[in-house]
């Protein structure tokens, strides 16, 4: 299982999108009985609505000096999950309300989502936040929110006994082993 975690660690996953489908394709290679299912964006499921599909190709914050303080390609936790696209330059003061950190865990990068409220943001360690200088910042989020689907999978593995054991997990939280 550690080998699986290492293979899947860097895949950019959310509750929808290509990273989730890539993860399930990898798991299907390990367990061929795995069967995918999908539900279209906008579908009402009990008290919940399946959100739009979200895919990202790039996201970063870069100070005018060239120093990057968040880079989705290095750690996809840096981007608030479901961030809307943006490509602009802004001041430190305008950027700060869009940054999230955990002062009580100064070396950790938080995991933040925004499935239903259109917004953008970045997550960084509190130590990095405190090192950010005043000045201008290039802010890029190359993402797309579109009609798509929520994809999941299930498998029935027949064992030696008649009892059933259910294993359930999520794969939507990227780069975390203990969430």
Predicted regions and their residues:
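N-terminal hydrophobic/helix-forming segments and targeting peptides
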Residues: 1-179
């Amino acid at each position: 299982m550690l080998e699986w975690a290492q293979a899947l660690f860097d895949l950019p996953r959310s509750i929808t999108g290509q990273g989730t489908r890539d993860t399930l394709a990898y798991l299907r290679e390990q367990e061929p009985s795995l069967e995918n299912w999908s539900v279209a964006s906008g579908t009402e499921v009990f008290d919940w609505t399946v959100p739009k599909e979200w895919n990202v190709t790039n996201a970063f914050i870069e100070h005018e000096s060239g120093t990057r303080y968040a880079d989705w390609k290095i750690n996809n936790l840096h981007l608030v999950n479901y961030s809307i696209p943006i490509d602009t330059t802004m001041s430190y003061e305008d950027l700060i309300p869009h940054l999230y950190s955990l002062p009580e865990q100064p070396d950790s990068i938080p995991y933040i989502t925004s499935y239903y409220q259109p917004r953008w943001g970045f997550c960084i360690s509190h130590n990095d936040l405190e090192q950010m200088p005043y000045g201008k910042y290039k802010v890029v989020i190359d993402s797309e929110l579109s009609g798509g689907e929520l994809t999941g999978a299930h498998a029935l593995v027949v064992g030696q006994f008649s009892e059933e054991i259910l294993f359930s997990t999520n794969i939507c939280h990227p780069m975390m082993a203990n969430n």
